[in-house]
Amino acid sequence: MFIKEVASSLYAWDLADEGIATIADNLQERANCNCMYLVGVMHYEKRPLTSLYYTHNTKRKFYLPENSRAYYRLNMDSFKNTKLKSCFTERDFLKGVDWLDVLTEEARKRGMKTGVELSHTIFDTNIAREQYPEMMQRDVNGGIVKDLQGLLCPNHPDVHEFQRAMFYDSVKNHDVDIVQTCLLTFGAGQPVKAPWFFAPWMDIENPSMGAILGLADGGCFCEHCRAKAIKWGYDWERIVHDMKTIHAIAHATPYAFQDYLMENNLTLGSNLTDCMLYIEYPGLLDFIKFRIQSITELFADIYKSVHEAKPGIDFRYNNHVRYPEYTGISFKDIAPYVDSVRESDYSEQRGAPDKFVFKRNTLHKIRRGIGFDKDLISALAVRPNATPELIRESLGVLAQCGIDGLSLGHYDGAHMEHLDAIKQGMSEYNITIVK
């Protein structure tokens, strides 16, 4: 099997603590890496994420990043048409250094590809809530969508322009081959659980209709979404009416929304399909279609901008959700506006109890959507809780899935023997890197 790359993400504090040369040595020699990319704007999330402590960082045991700070230079003229302006790191040991340049300069010395990732949130969500509440996503009842990381509405003109400008400037002013994003799009709400007393005969945590009912808590229902939906020919009043009904069903209990309680219980406890919900509530289907059209429009604008900045750039979407269509992502719709897709399944760190069925299924779903002229990159977990044996087994599965590259998740929490397992597994399953 032939692939184009083995990539690894890195953080600015990794480079500051361990040194880019040491990191690059480890990645090249142990894991066959030929691509490094900086998570240039990182959301608010403790590192390492899946374990208590770092495994090979001699400077610190863990790190608590700032909220959505940029770790490289940006030309602020690029943001003249939006109220939102990028925020930069305020940590003394990181300030004053363009960490993306540090990475790219070392990578080029070694003949490696380079990239930058704009992560889940690319603007400080605390500042957004305090100073720009009108830009936050709204639920069907007009409240700000509840989400741990905060969700800006991509249909708000200032948000849309800020997101476009961030990608454009990152590509225009840096020596990168790839610009990748796992940008949070529309809130999908939280899956609804079945009644507790169904537990003897079903998994109440994962009823088949739980995720789609949870959409009723997602966004966005702001004035800008309303105006755009009407402009595109959607019946906005029907969308709002049907989503309010689904919201009542989703939240029905013996003490609230009682008129919908039996509907809730029988929907969650049955083998009803989402198809029937679309028939009964056409506004639900329109809501999903509108969100997909909105995100496709955003991706089209970003794609055009980054290719104007650098025609050969690889604009890569990093899929990180189980049901992307519930967040506005349709792989068939965005296919013309991406160059590649990374799938962020990390079954290895959970012991792969399903024998990598979900990983296979998801890769096939993405390939079905993007076709065969766009690259498909599969993630592997090299973090604690994975094992060298599982990593090699995963590579054996991936060798059957028609992927175009591998991406390690993530170096900061990796065990060195897990990096070694990448090289070993590639040899065992005849996975070869070609340019």
Locate the predicted segments by residue.
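Hydrophobic faces of well-ordered beta-strands that scaffold small-molecule active sites
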Residues: 4-10, 34-38, 114-118, 179-181, ...
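The substrate-binding groove and active-site-proximal loops of carbohydrate-active enzymes
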Residues: 6-16, 75-97, 145-161, 282-295, ...
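Short, acidic/polar
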Residues: 14-29, 159-170, 323-336, 387-399
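Surface-exposed amphipathic alpha-helices with a cationic face
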Residues: 28, 100-115, 299-313, 363-375, ...
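Aromatic-lined carbohydrate-binding/catalytic grooves of carbohydrate-active enzymes
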Residues: 33-94, 422
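Substrate-binding cleft of secreted/luminal carbohydrate-active enzymes
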Residues: 39-43, 338, 343-355, 377-434
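Polysaccharide-binding and catalytic clefts of secreted carbohydrate-active enzymes
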Residues: 119-121, 132-337, 346-347
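Active-site clefts of carbohydrate-active enzymes
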Residues: 264-284, 317, 364-393
